Each structure stands twice: as structure tokens, then as C-alpha cells.
């Protein structure tokens, strides 16, 4: 985020300088430079809006406020540029003066051509605005998608960890069952031997008694 903000500050210095030059000259080259810089600034702000999804919630409010301020300033620059373009177009439209009276003059053909040019410029600007808005929405959607993917990745890791723990528990359970089976076999053997010894003792006692009373 810091990298994008540094880039924004550099672009801000450039656009403010260009807008100042435009107010003085009104040249088409300066207008094109301003439009290019505004598009770059819009892209940088769009990247900030994507990056904010990865910022901790405790810091997100402050950063989001700065981003809103950047976008508001961008809209002000766009309005300023639009006003300067209008001034430049009006100057181009009524730029010829009568040398004797000093009044602006323009032929009907020039007027029609320049009117169509202004209309075409306005349509182009509207299309550019719609394109930029679509790009901003796409950037926001991409940010939401990236956040969802991160959440899914985290859930996958948790699931894998749970499966590992379940596997360990299953292994411990198998070992416990084997131990219980071994103990049960030993208990059965001990019971068999104990029963056999008791039976032998009973037989011996009976033999002794039999020999005495014979």
C-alpha cells in the first residue's frame, strides 16, 4: 500500500503542474498529458482499493478514508480538466477576430465542424468515463475475489490440519486397541494357567485323601 501511495504522490505533483500549464496555454499536448496522468492515477487508486482487502481490520478504516480522499481529489481534477477543455474548445471555435472591429467571426461551415467536434469530444469523454467506471468495478470485483480465495485457502489449510489430527488420533486408537487385545490374551492365558493349577491341586488333595482312607 505504501508503494502505491508514493506513486500517487508523484502523479499528483505531475498532474497539478500540468493543470497549471494547461490554464496558461490550453495546448492539446498538455490536455493529452493530463488525461494520461488522470488515467494512471485512477489505476493506482484502483490498486489501493484491491490492496485494502489484505489490511488488518483495525487499520482498514483509516486507509479507506485516505483512498476516498484520493478519489474525491481525482474527480476534482477531472472537472478542472473538463472546464479547461471547454475553454480551449470555445477559444478554437471563436478564435478568429475581425481585424477592424475586433469581434470574433466564424463561417457557418467552421461553426458546424467545430460543433460536431465538440459533440464528438463530449461523447468520447463520456465513453472514457464509463470505461473507467467499468474498470473500477472490475478492480473491486477482483479484490473481492482475491479475498474469497484467501479465505478458501485458509479454510483448506484448517481442513488439512484437522485431517492430520484425525489421522494421528486414528493411529493412537489403533495402538490402544492392539494393546487391549494383547492384555486380553494375556489375561485369558493367566486365567487358564490358574484354573489348571487349581485343578491339579484338587486332584492331588483327592489322591492324598484317598491314600489315607484306603
Curated annotation (Swiss-Prot):
Predominant location: membrane
TM region positions: 192-212
Signal peptide extent: none
Any one cellular-component term (Gene Ontology): SNARE complex
UniProt-listed CDD domains: SNARE_Vti1
Single GO molecular function: SNAP receptor activity
Keyword Transmembrane helix among UniProt keywords: yes
A biological process from GO: intracellular protein transport
Known function: V-SNARE that mediates vesicle transport pathways through interactions with t-SNAREs on the target membrane. These interactions are proposed to mediate aspects of the specificity of vesicle trafficking and to promote fusion of the lipid bilayers.
Name of the featured protein: Vesicle transport v-SNARE protein vti1
Organism annotation: Schizosaccharomyces pombe (strain 972 / ATCC 24843) (Fission yeast)
Source organism phylogeny: Eukaryota, Fungi, Dikarya, Ascomycota, Taphrinomycotina
Encoding gene per record: vti1
Amino acid at each position: 500500500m505504501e508503494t502505491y501511495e508514493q506513486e500517487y504522490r508523484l502523479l499528483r505533483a505531475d498532474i497539478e503542474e500540468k493543470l497549471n500549464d494547461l490554464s496558461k496555454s490550453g495546448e492539446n499536448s498538455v490536455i493529452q498529458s493530463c488525461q494520461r496522468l488522470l488515467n494512471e492515477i485512477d489505476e493506482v487508486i484502483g490498486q489501493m482499493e484491491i490492496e485494502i482487502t489484505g489490511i488488518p481490520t483495525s487499520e482498514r478504516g483509516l486507509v479507506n478514508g485516505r483512498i476516498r480522499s484520493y478519489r474525491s481529489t481525482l474527480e476534482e481534477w477531472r472537472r478542472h480538466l473538463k472546464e479547461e477543455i471547454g475553454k480551449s474548445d470555445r477559444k478554437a471555435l471563436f478564435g478568429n477576430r475581425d481585424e477592424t472591429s475586433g469581434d470574433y467571426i466564424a463561417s457557418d461551415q467552421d461553426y458546424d465542424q467545430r460543433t460536431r467536434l465538440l459533440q464528438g469530444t463530449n461523447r468520447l469523454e463520456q465513453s472514457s468515463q464509463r470505461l473507467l467506471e467499468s474498470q473500477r468495478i472490475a478492480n473491486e470485483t477482483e479484490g473481492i475475489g482475491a479475498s474469497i480465495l484467501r479465505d478458501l485457502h485458509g479454510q483448506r489449510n484448517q481442513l488439512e490440519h484437522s485431517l492430520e489430527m484425525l489421522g494421528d488420533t486414528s493411529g493412537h486408537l489403533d495402538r490402544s486397541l492392539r494393546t487391549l487385545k494383547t492384555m486380553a490374551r494375556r489375561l485369558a492365558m493367566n486365567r487358564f494357567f490358574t484354573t489348571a493349577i487349581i485343578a491339579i491341586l484338587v486332584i492331588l488333595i483327592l489322591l492324598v485323601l484317598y491314600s489315607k482312607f484306603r
